């Protein structure tokens, strides 16, 4: 009944569901179209152009399967809820990795491209893990920051700023490693265009399980309401 609470919940839905969904959808479609174009430039022909689209379809189906494994019990703790959501996300990624192998071989016959896809999937899961590590109250970084609040607001501001800066290091290193590995795995040493295609297909692989990832991100606003 509090208008401020209602406005806060509406803001959560607008920002964390509608806004984030539009942002991630734009990234998803952009990566598919970019890889579509790079497939033609790299000399793969229509096979290289259709692969990112098929990979996206495969990822959507695997995301749907992963949602069926997100199960909780009555009066479950927050830790068990997060574990259940994590299980569904990782399972969808594993299914996508397994399905991408025969798909890539049938369409292109190039295991290097599959290695780039796998690199993107692993990198996406790793970024998700480190994001949870630095933001969840079940891990030490946020627990230490909460303990710092006992000494005053200054320590919270300083500690929060430093923690936020440190939290980006892992993601930066993972993205850099994924770009480098996927570039050379797809044949970037011999052909620059094929290396760029490897980076693009790795991005599609990283975003292929966007369906369940976006559903997991929407858990917060839904739970608040």
Predicted regions and their residues:
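Hydrophobic packing and interface segments
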Residues: 1-225
């Amino acid at each position: 009944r509090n208008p401020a609470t209602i406005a806060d919940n509406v803001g959560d839905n607008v920002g964390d569901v509608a806004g984030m969904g539009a942002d991630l959808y734009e990234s998803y479609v952009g990566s598919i179209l970019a890889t579509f174009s790079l497939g033609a430039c790299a000399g793969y022909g229509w096979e290289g152009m259709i692969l990112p689209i098929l990979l996206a379809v495969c990822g959507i189906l695997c995301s749907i399967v992963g949602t069926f494994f997100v199960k909780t019990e009555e009066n479950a703790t927050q830790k068990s809820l997060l574990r259940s959501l994590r299980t569904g996300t990782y399972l969808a990624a594993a299914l996508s990795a397994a399905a991408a192998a025969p798909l890539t071989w049938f369409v292109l016959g190039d295991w290097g491209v599959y290695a780039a896809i796998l690199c993107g999937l692993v990198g996406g899961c790793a970024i998700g893990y480190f994001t949870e590590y630095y933001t969840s109250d079940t891990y030490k970084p946020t627990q230490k920051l909460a303990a710092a609040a006992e000494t005053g607001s200054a320590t919270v501001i300083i500690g929060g700023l430093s923690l936020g800066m440190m939290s980006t290091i892992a993601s930066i290193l993972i993205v850099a490693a994924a770009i480098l590995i996927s570039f050379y795995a797809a044949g970037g040493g011999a052909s620059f265009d094929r290396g760029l295609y490897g980076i693009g297909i790795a991005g599609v692989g990283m975003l292929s399980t966007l369906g369940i990832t976006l559903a997991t991100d929407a858990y917060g606003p839904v739970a608040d309401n």
